[in-house]
Amino acid sequence: IRTDKSAYIAGEPLTVTVTLRDEFGNPAFGLTSEVIESYIDSFAVGGATPDSMQWVEQNNGEYTIVWTAWGAEENLVASLKLKTWAAEIKSSLYGIQPGAAAKTQSTIVADKTIYIAGDSITVTVVLKDAQGNFITDGVVQLNEENVQVRNADPIQGNNWVYNGNGQYQRQYMAHFAEANLNAQLKMAGWSDANYSNNYTIKPGEVSPLGSQLRIREVLVVEGADLPVSALLVDDFGNPVDNGLDLLDDAVYLQNVEKKEGEKWRYVGDGIYERTYMAYQEGENLTSFMEIKGWRIYGQPSYNILPFVEVESLSVNGVKFRATDGFPETGFDGAKFTLLLTHNMKNTDYNWTAGIYGINVDSNGEVTLSVLIRSEVTITGKPKNGKGNDVVFKFKIKKWFTSLGASSSNTWDIINTSCSYGQMPSSLELAQRPSGGVVPRKVGTLWGEYGNLKTYGNAFSSTDYWTSTQLMGVHEKFNPETGISELGTGKSSGLCVEYY
């Protein structure tokens, strides 16, 4: 008895040949398969499975039968014993090796269903051929092409290890966070892959490697909002979505404070936003974020400009604070100059009142020419586009009109000369002098503008009648000194309108 080969691959045909002779060595010719079967007491082919039991006569008493190599094993034999024999005969030794890995028999499994980025994923592959034989040389067969572990990479220096029974293991490192992931096994010749159980990779702890603190406005004004964003990611760049508690006290911004009512809010993709408030001017200011002992600096640096506003008004040698309410009075030709905080220059702004009758030149000098009955808003916009708009508002309550030197006449005539309004009293024009000096205060014409003679021809007369009288004598107002005294004869007319 003999086999056609000494080595087989599982699934291959295995041909057994027996030579039947009588005791004198004569070949037994012409035996049918049925006759041979009737003689057989036992017939076995190690590691093989029968395809059929049909014996086929060849020549010289040789008969063959074909089985299929099946179970992988070494040192196998085929054996035969006829009923008349005292012992069996055996073939030479042969071996059966496993066949190619079969998709229907092989598996791939991940050791968990949930990982944290940076965790080790143990992948177990079992390789079997179509006959269920364990494949023992998988270490050389498995590679990055036929085994793919989604969102993970092989751990450096870690290779496939054979554990016996067709089982192989290797460690991978989880990196990109995602749900519904799997590992795939697709050996050569397979039309599609086998898949492991699904698993999820979650982000790891916040890491300084990719996290950022971003200043979203690099130039703001004192008191203005400063928007800030933070990007929180783990070592692998995965967005961290549970960082609100970490950020509460983790961010420092120079010359900036927390804005009341504002908190960090998560906007997605690991990005958090918050609005702070700039409280003090400064240049090249810095910021940082410090979490669990590590620190990263915000980018870019930023500047806080001073909040510029009108600090005071310069009026004919006197300054009024912007909060004093100047001007309450006005006349055609009245002038005053805006003085800004932080020693800022008026020439660095483009000034406008946006209404006819109010002119503002490049030096911030305001000239009134027409009565404006509503509130006036003067705006200065920075020429370089940096900083806040400077805004000054005022409303004229009393508008004075000089009738000119040519109007000089008696009080009775002047008293009826005001087409609009009426003749003002002395105290509407100026307060009484103290120590010979008329006070410069808001609320009276001379108190606000001083020597009215300095305003061109607006007050060309020497004096003007007032409605104030003492013992039947009316007072005359001196536009140069601001002093009113009892007078007779003629004087010029001055009218006031109220708004």
For every predicted segment, state its role.
Residues 312-313, 317-334, 339-346, 352-423, ...:
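Extracellular adhesion/carbohydrate-recognition regions
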Residues 57-65, 162-170, 266-274, 361-365:
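Aromatic sugar-binding surface patches on proteins
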Residues 65-71, 170-176, 274-280, 366-370:
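Short, hydrophobic beta-strand segments
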Residues 428-480, 497-498:
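An exposed tryptophan-centered "aromatic clamp" motif
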Residues 13-15, 20-55, 119-121, 127-158, ...:
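Short flexible loop/turn segments that cap and initiate beta-strands
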Residues 1-29, 42, 72-134, 186-239, ...:
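Short S/T/G/P-enriched beta-strand
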Residues 75-82, 180-187, 284-292, 373-384:
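A short beta-strand micro-motif common to beta-rich folds, especially ectodomain repeats
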